[in-house]
Design a protein with these regions (language model features):
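Hydrophobic helix-and-loop "lid/oligomerization" segment in the mid-to-C-terminal part
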Residues: 14-236, 244-247
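Active-site cavity-forming subdomains of large catalytic enzyme subunits
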Residues: 1-16, 42
């Protein structure tokens, strides 16, 4: 993810300039970002996350401590994915990511407490909106299809990704959640299931899309509203053919 790339640039700069700065103190940021962005935990990602989790468990930043209070035991990938990550992402989805930046670099405990309370309120609001969208989206699920592709008017764009993840929990298939972002344009988030490269399937549909980007397990896209049915059927056909007409299993 972008945070991991930034970290590699910092370490390369240190090597080039022979700097004595200990860059390992930033690995907690890398772990949080890599896991929250659902990046594959392979190769260097896996190594950086391993060491980043060690930093979080041994010397957590002041801004993280309130989040950690509600978690029992050692912080691992799962606890970041399901507890800390959603709170971090909620700020950007519901208001602005700057709140999280300010929180993570804050060294005053009182200011950090105030910021973490703000984040918690945003997360609670996100959960209410998410539940409403999930309830609407579930009514569009077709159990006979190999994909979940749903679209709703007025859905908050900030929760589309997590709604897609929630739908996968109920119906284990590659999932796309879309809403109308502006006049006649649909914007959406894509989430995949284990071992299925959803980005490749999007690439095979690119002629019907205005824009798309992401990686194997998560992506975003835009398309004309008039192309929705064409895209929905094309994506379904590609996924169905690629898995040999066998339904996904956990």
């Amino acid at each position: 993810c972008g945070c991991g790339i930034a970290y590699k640039l910092i370490t390369a700069h240190n090597t080039f300039t022979e700097s004595s700065i200990d860059t390992s103190i930033f690995l907690d940021f890398v772990a949080l970002a890599t896991i929250s962005d659902m990046m594959p935990l392979i190769d260097e990602n896996r190594i950086m996350v391993f060491h980043g989790l060690n930093v979080i468990n041994s010397k957590p930043r002041i801004g993280l401590r309130n989040f950690l209070k509600s978690i029992n035991g050692k912080i691992d990938e799962s606890k970041i994915s399901f507890n800390i990550g959603p709170r971090i992402n909620a700020a950007g989805r519901m208001k602005t990511g700057k709140i999280i930046v300010d929180l993570l670099i804050e060294e005053d405990i009182n200011i950090a407490n105030s910021l973490s309370n703000d984040v918690e309120h945003l997360n609670q609001n996100r959960r209410r909106i998410e539940k409403s969208v999930v309830d609407e989206a579930l009514s569009q699920i077709d159990n006979q299809r190999y994909t979940n592709i749903v679209c709703g008017e007025g859905w908050n764009q900030g929760v589309l990704g997590i709604v897609a993840s929630r739908l996968i929990e109920r119906s284990y298939k590659p999932t796309i959640v879309l809403t109308e972002s502006n006049d006649e344009i649909l914007t959406g988030s894509v989430r995949s299931v284990k071992d299925y490269d959803v980005y490749k399937s999007l690439s095979d549909c690119q002629e019907t899309l205005l824009q798309y980007g992401g990686h194997k397990y998560a992506a975003g896209l835009k398309l004309k509203k008039s192309n929705f049915d064409i895209f929905k059927n094309q994506f379904e056909s590609i996924v169905k053919d690629s898995v040999g007409h066998k339904m996904f299993t956990r």
